[in-house]
Amino acid sequence: MSHPIQFVNANNSDKSHQLGGQYSIPQDLRENLQKEAARIGENEKDVLQEKMETRTVQNREDSYHKRRFDMKFEPDSDTQTVTSSENTQDAVVPRKRKSRWDVKGYEPPDESSTAVKENSDSALVNVEGIHDLMFFKPSDHKYFADVISKKPIDELNKDEKKERTLSMLLLKIKNGNTASRRTSMRILTDKAVTFGPEMIFNRLLPILLDRSLEDQERHLMIKTIDRVLYQLGDLTKPYVHKILVVAAPLLIDEDPMVRSTGQEIITNLSTVAGLKTILTVMRPDIENEDEYVRNVTSRAAAVVAKALGVNQLLPFINAACHSRKSWKARHTGIKIVQQIGILLGIGVLNHLTGLMSCIKDCLMDDHVPVRIVTAHTLSTLAENSYPYGIEVFNVVLEPLWKGIRSHRGKVLSSFLKAVGSMIPLMDPEYAGYYTTEAMRIIRREFDSPDDEMKKTILLVLQKCSAVESITPKFLREEIAPEFFQKFWVRRVALDRPLNKVVTYTTVTLAKKLGCSYTIDKLLTPLRDEAEPFRTMAVHAVTRTVNLLGTADLDERLETRLIDALLIAFQEQTNSDSIIFKGFGAVTVSLDIRMKPFLAPIVSTILNHLKHKTPLVRQHAADLCAILIPVIKNCHEFEMLNKLNIILYESLGEVYPEVLGSIINAMYCITSVMDLDKLQPPINQILPTLTPILRNKHRKVEVNTIKFVGLIGKLAPTYAPPKEWMRICFELLELLKSTNKEIRRSANATFGFIAEAIGPHDVLVALLNNLKVQERQLRVCTAVAIGIVAKVCGPYNVLPVIMNEYTTPETNVQNGVLKAMSFMFEYIGNMSKDYIYFITPLLEDALTDRDLVHRQTASNVITHLALNCSGTGHEDAFIHLMNLLIPNIFETSPHAIMRILEGLEALSQALGPGLFMNYIWAGLFHPAKNVRKAFWRVYNNMYVMYQDAMVPFYPVTPDNNEEYIEELDLVL
């Protein structure tokens, strides 16, 4: 808890007793500090308030992105009023000095301030007309004051009533529950023209610039703008600038979903308002003094170009890029071209010539920022044009090359990057020449201290190393030694972005240098004292070995590599998993060549399994699991048994992360060993695992269930049936887990256990679970019953669960139907043998008063009909059709979805002709709701059987033709 700062002389005591000189900070500064300290003391926030603050968009953005809150609309009376009131609130009020006569005794307040606040908030949320609100924030007072005002609606004029209605709709969209939000959004969309653009945008746009807005609220407000734009059409033209002020900053948001939403709004706006209006609005911002405004304007213009066509914008871009009035306009024009290249991707090829004519002259511009952004734009266009378009870039190669030889610093970096991006587009002979020349510059700039230059060198090096004329010999003699000397240093390891680029470049160079040479150069970093440097080296070794293998490593280099990796593993103190994953990648690649090194590695693992630090024990167990297949390939079965015994003795581990890794290692050993020779034996391991199933840690649960399932699959006879039943009851508890992977593993394990000890005992435990109230547990139990039926045969399960259906309890009957649904989905066309067997049960379910019964029975019919189509059971399906078709008038969304699925499946089993006989009469029924239900089914049939339905359309009798009634009969 922070406390207010206590200042010397803050209590205004008598100064006549001060012996020293009265030298201090200025009075106004001291008063400001005192006010700030008092504010901190009064407004201390608890943890929940701090978390709520971090959810706001403003608090998650950096200083650059926060600048969008400073953007202003065109000045009008409303904004001036708000600004003046804000300035009044923020003005420094002179502090009034108190005398001792002003001090009064304590007087109890008439009302509790907390109670007053709570009552006022609840009154706001429950006020008439806005009862569906979920919350009402303090910042909402500013934008929705007319909604919560006490003024009677009869005293309002027509426009004020309309404004209050609009505010209420916006408030429900922003703060309301889901149903209220959808209704309000639909009403606002339908009445957008009635409200008019002025009223809507003056209310809506300021909310989007509110600093306390959260992601969800911002998303809803932006969605509202998007919907309204379609309705208003041309009426939005006067408000294009205001909308862009809100929408353009979304294009630089960190969240890709927000960026795509911003693009969608600007696309719709440009379509509605037209090119002329958009460009007229953007024109002043092209040469704005603020770099932030120019940046978002360039991105918005690129979106407009994508929406309306790049060719439409080319004259405007060309004029901006060749502007003589302002270099900032040229800078923004070039940036528009860059953003077009990013947005269109390979589609920029069609417009490459026109865009190049706009920017080619800017490489020789007098202003450095213009030259830099031009080079970056050329680089972007070249990367997005790969592997085509070098003919267009020929015009800029000469000025680029001259610039590389004459420039230094950031300009050189950008020019070098542009040439490096064009090299992959060139023919091999030209690419070889430019690469050789570029390599001289790269070698010279290896010593550059500038991080931007370093990244550019690395990117160009990646592209140049792929050129055919650059030989492995040239790289080894001229580039690689200096590259490893300059870039493989500790300082680079601490810079994460540069670290990643260096690692990737090393792997790219390794394709030509070879695995042996690269590994040899990385051995020194692997043994370094600095852990980040070792971790960086392991990353590079892992990716190199995965890419190239270890076939060209000699015996000496293998020994040194394993030794270095073992040192890195032993010295590890952080939680990065790459160390043992890298170790695993090398061992898997070496395979049987690892045999001489297994003894010291396993010895290290055993020592680490007894280490006092949990993280060390966890890494040892993880490495052990990775090494198991290699140890097995080396036929070191005694070593596996020794490891298994040590791991078994460690099952009393108290740290769940470590215990999960130990169980996973034991699982790996059991999966590769001969179970007759496994030590300790399965009948000793399984009873130890059963109580561990109660551990609620996710990693422990997943690995334990997986291990038990493996034992049930490979060695069911090694444990007595009673032990398996104990495990069944433990697994039933795991079906309640919130983790999907755990529930899926538990269900699969039920199948293995049922196969091991027979379905009857397992079914007893599962059927008891159908009687519980918890829906998720009943659903998982139904899935488990379906799996048992698939493993042990439906003939073992169906009689039992059909008998269970006679229980007069809704939950049990629903569970049985759901189990049948999963079962028939799993067993496929085996279902055909049981159609007549379960028809009476489905008949009962489809005529039940409970909607969920009918819904689940429809699901059963869906799987039956799809799996048994064409098997000659049409009579049973017609019977089920007669029972299902009356349900098409249901209004519940979940139920009608399942019922329609069932009808579509029956149409597959019966054919469109027979099925459509049930539909024709309903299509022209006098009641609208009846027609609506049947037309919905007909539309689905029309999509599925458009051509097959033609012979079955009703034939009207014609006096001129002979009409044969028998052809309409279904035999």
From Swiss-Prot:
Keyword Transmembrane: no
Protein family membership: Belongs to the SF3B1 family.
Residue segments, region Disordered: 1-22, 54-118
GO molecular function terms attached to this record: mRNA binding
Protein name, entry field: U2 snRNP component HSH155
Source organism (scientific name): Saccharomyces cerevisiae (strain ATCC 204508 / S288c) (Baker's yeast)
Keywords: mRNA processing, mRNA splicing, Nucleus, Repeat, Spliceosome
Known function: Contacts pre-mRNA on both sides of the branch site early in spliceosome assembly.
UniProt subunit comment: Belongs to the CWC complex (or CEF1-associated complex), a spliceosome sub-complex reminiscent of a late-stage spliceosome composed of the U2, U5 and U6 snRNAs and at least BUD13, BUD31, BRR2, CDC40, CEF1, CLF1, CUS1, CWC2, CWC15, CWC21, CWC22, CWC23, CWC24, CWC25, CWC27, ECM2, HSH155, IST3, ISY1, LEA1, MSL1, NTC20, PRP8, PRP9, PRP11, PRP19, PRP21, PRP22, PRP45, PRP46, SLU7, SMB1, SMD1, SMD2, SMD3, SMX2, SMX3, SNT309, SNU114, SPP2, SYF1, SYF2, RSE1 and YJU2. Interacts with RDS3.
GO CC field: catalytic step 2 spliceosome; nucleus; Prp19 complex; spliceosomal complex; U2 snRNP; U2-type prespliceosome; U2-type spliceosomal complex
GO biological process per UniProt: mRNA splicing, via spliceosome; spliceosomal complex assembly; U2-type prespliceosome assembly
Compartments in which it is found: Nucleus
HEAT repeat locations: 199-237, 273-310, 350-387, 513-550, 596-633, 680-717, 722-759, 792-829, 832-870
